[in-house]
């Protein structure tokens, strides 16, 4: 067996496995039920109903998708729910993006990367 045949014999299976992993990955899918359970069971948001909770979550997705800064989204949520707690706001953002618009996870991570909570 010559060198090029050996290289091809070793490279082809590795490329096949790598391509199968990339091409075979299922797309991220929204899970509205998980979102609703997580934000309606958790105290503090007090959505009037499931439609209001979903609408609010989709607004968060729109904000993140349009490039609104993490700081701005956090501030709006804190204001809307009259709650200064960073954890409460970030929980809602994470639930919305992870469950309703998972394709935006990368954008959320980039936006939140340099976020620093305000000093009390």
How would you describe each model-predicted region?
Residues 68-120:
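Compact alpha-helical subdomains of small soluble proteins
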Residues 39-45, 50-51:
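Extracytoplasmic/periplasm-facing segments of secreted or lipoprotein envelope proteins
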Residues 20-37:
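C-terminal region of N-terminal signal peptides and the immediate post-cleavage residues
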Residues 1-13:
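Bacterial N-terminal signal peptides that target proteins for export
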Residues 45-48, 64-65, 83-85:
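Short acidic, glycine/proline-enriched loop segments that cap or flank alpha-helices
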Residues 11-21:
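Bacterial N-terminal signal peptides
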Residues 53-66, 78:
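Amphipathic alpha-helical segments that form the core helices of the histone-fold
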Residues 35-38, 56-59, 73-76, 92:
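A general alpha-helix detector
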């Amino acid at each position: 067996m010559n060198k090029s045949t050996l290289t091809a014999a070793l490279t082809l299976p590795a490329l096949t496995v790598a391509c199968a992993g990339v091409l075979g990955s299922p797309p991220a899918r929204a899970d509205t039920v998980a979102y609703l359970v997580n934000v309606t069971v958790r105290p503090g948001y007090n959505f009037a109903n499931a439609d209001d909770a979903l609408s609010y979550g989709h607004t968060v997705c729109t904000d993140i998708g349009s490039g609104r800064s993490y700081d701005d989204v956090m501030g709006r949520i804190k204001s809307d729910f009259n709650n200064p707690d960073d954890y409460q706001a970030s929980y809602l953002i994470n639930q919305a993006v992870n469950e309703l618009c998972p394709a935006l996870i990368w954008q959320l991570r980039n936006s939140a990367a340099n976020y620093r909570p305000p000093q009390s």
